Amino acid sequence: MNLKISNSQIEHIKGANSYLIVSTFLIFIVGLYFSLLDSPPDYIQGDSMRIMYVHVPSAWLSLFSYTILAISCIVWFVTRNPIFNLFAKSIAPIGAAFTLIALVTGSIWGKPTWGVWWVWDARLTSMLLLFFLYLAYILLWQSIINQETAAKISAVLGIIGFINIPIIKFSVDWWNTLHQPATISKLSAPSIDINMLI
């Protein structure tokens, strides 16, 4: 399938893109201000709790990104439409970045809270595996010269790697871990204050 974009469409996208970049940057700065500087310290953990405002969204986005990657791989297998390869290839580095941010901010928070930078906790280990899955997906695309072969092998990895997503999500329920249980559940109201959730 050949996707053709006219010059006027490209100019329109470039114009909209600059507005999106500026608005995203401003919203990001405002969000960081309110979450890291304006929010009150936790009554137990103090100021170290503020890093959760970066850690938790990064972890959620890393799981969401891999879910999009896996869905794109499945749809590519069914339709062989190259746009879905492009979706998966494009979101892999974004997901890897969010996973790395979640791992690093979790370690920064873990040092004063748990007393160590890293423990081989079920959720931590499965998040580290997710980071390696992202890296493997990216490296497969870059190391295999034949694009059709790279697409097939990468799609298989993307689909099989999705098994790790429910393991990450439910690891706190299945095993005795240092992480707290889920604060958002389908069966009950969230245990986190609604103002903090928003």
Annotate each predicted stretch with a short phrase.
Residues 25-43:
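Alpha-helical transmembrane segments of multi-pass membrane proteins
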Residues 8-24:
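N-terminal membrane topogenic signal
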Residues 56, 176-198:
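Membrane-interface transmembrane-helix boundary segments in multi-pass integral membrane proteins
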Residues 154-170:
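Hydrophobic alpha-helical membrane-insertion segments
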Residues 13, 78-90, 144-150:
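Membrane-interface helix-boundary motifs at transmembrane edges
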Residues 94-139:
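Membrane-interface helix-loop-helix modules in multi-pass inner-membrane proteins
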Residues 46-53, 113-127, 150-154:
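Non-cytosolic membrane-interface motifs at loop->transmembrane helix junctions
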Residues 52-66:
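Interfacial helix-start motif at the membrane-water boundary
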